[in-house]
């Protein structure tokens, strides 16, 4: 669904259904140095496959994060009022895979496009082998599952399917359902009622239009004070009180709360990094945001991009681009590319009237302690304001 970035909303407002590219008469683009390009691509593939998370992504996909983030105490639960969900195992990647092994036509590991070497996607089916959804991801499970206290993975998959069909973001709709539950519109954990509500989006009922407009709109309409959004976009499935670098990314990303902009997680390669410290979060967020903006500009998938953050794999990526374009590129190429993209995004936001006041998490993350850790988001404002200010 073209929902998370707002692309679907813009297209819908213009009654634009599709963009069709006709390559008739176009000359195929080929690498300038084919031999060096093949060599660099081979090295790049090895670097991606050597990533420690690689086997888990291939065998389980992003839902492998459910139990991991739940164990960190940062799994959004009951509209971000808790950091752990008692029903986490019932919606975990491991449980999902066991179900899929028993179901006809299910594919626990699936390439979302030809040539992918990560294969982190999947095809999730029902007991009869009918496809419910393909690309059943961690973020959907977190926002539509634990965040709404729903522990029925099939119900979550069906909600995912409906969101795909009507072209809305599962994270923002999950956030909208949770704030609606907080307002008393439906009961916590009532999966059937939640699925029925999501189906109303396509029917354009009053409730459906409200939910379809997302988390912030729904919360404001219902008078809910605890609305988990930045710049109008719902937070992802990582509570920023426990993963404070992610909170900095949520705050400062030009797009709003966006984990893909720079997901700052504990890294075995950097044991000194403390995700719960109030200081030292701006630097990691800035580094990742710059790298990911560069990789986005190159059209790289995030799952392939994350293993390329270290200097050696990153130099291999730069060699790959250099061999393709025929242009000499230095070690700062990716950082410069990312910085250029972030500057352009920031310039747009400045022109649209956004200020530093918009680079903030909702107050409740700063004031309410997150069980079970008792953490609050307490990164100093001056550290937040140092990010993406070029």
Please identify what each model-predicted range represents:
Residues 1-7, 11-390:
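Extended C-terminal regions of large enzymes
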């Amino acid at each position: 669904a073209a929902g998370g970035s707002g692309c679907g909303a813009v297209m819908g407002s213009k009654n634009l259904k599709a963009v069709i590219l006709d390559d008739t008469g176009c000359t195929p683009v080929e690498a300038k140095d084919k031999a060096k390009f093949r060599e660099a691509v081979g090295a790049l593939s090895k670097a991606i496959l050597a990533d420690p998370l690689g086997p888990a992504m291939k065998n389980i996909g992003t839902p492998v994060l459910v139990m991991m983030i739940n164990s960190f105490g940062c799994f959004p639960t009951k509209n971000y009022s808790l950091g752990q969900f008692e029903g986490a195992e019932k919606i975990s990647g491991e449980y999902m895979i066991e179900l899929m092994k028993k179901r006809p036509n299910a594919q626990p590991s699936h390439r979302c496009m030809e040539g992918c070497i990560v294969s982190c996607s999947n095809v999730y089916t029902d007991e009869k082998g009918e496809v419910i959804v393909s690309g059943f991801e961690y973020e959907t499970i977190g926002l539509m599952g634990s965040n709404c206290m729903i522990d029925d993975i099939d119900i979550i998959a069906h909600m995912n399917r409906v969101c795909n069909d009507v072209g809305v973001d599962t994270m923002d709709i999950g956030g909208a359902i949770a704030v609606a539950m907080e307002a008393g519109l439906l009961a916590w954990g009532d999966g059937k009622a939640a699925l029925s509500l999501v189906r109303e989006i396509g029917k354009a009922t009053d409730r459906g239009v409200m939910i379809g407009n997302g988390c912030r709109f729904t919360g404001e309409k219902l008078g809910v004070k605890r609305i988990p959004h930045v710049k109008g976009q719902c937070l992802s499935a990582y509570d920023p009180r426990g993963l404070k670098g992610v909170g900095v990314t949520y705050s400062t990303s030009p797009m709003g709360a966006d984990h893909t902009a720079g997901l700052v997680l504990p890294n075995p390669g950097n044991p000194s990094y403390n995700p719960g410290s109030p200081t030292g979060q701006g630097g990691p967020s800035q580094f990742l945001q710059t790298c990911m903006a560069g990789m986005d500009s190159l059209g790289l998938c995030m799952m392939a991009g994350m293993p390329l953050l270290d200097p050696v794999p990153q130099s291999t990526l730069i060699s790959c681009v250099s061999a393709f374009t025929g242009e000499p590129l230095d070690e700062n190429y990716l950082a410069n590319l990312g910085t250029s993209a972030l500057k352009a995004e920031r310039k747009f936001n400045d022109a649209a009237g956004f200020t530093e006041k918009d680079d903030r998490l909702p107050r409740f993350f700063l004031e309410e302690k997150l069980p079970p850790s008792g953490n609050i988001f307490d990164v100093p404002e001056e550290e937040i304001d140092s990010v993406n200010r070029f």
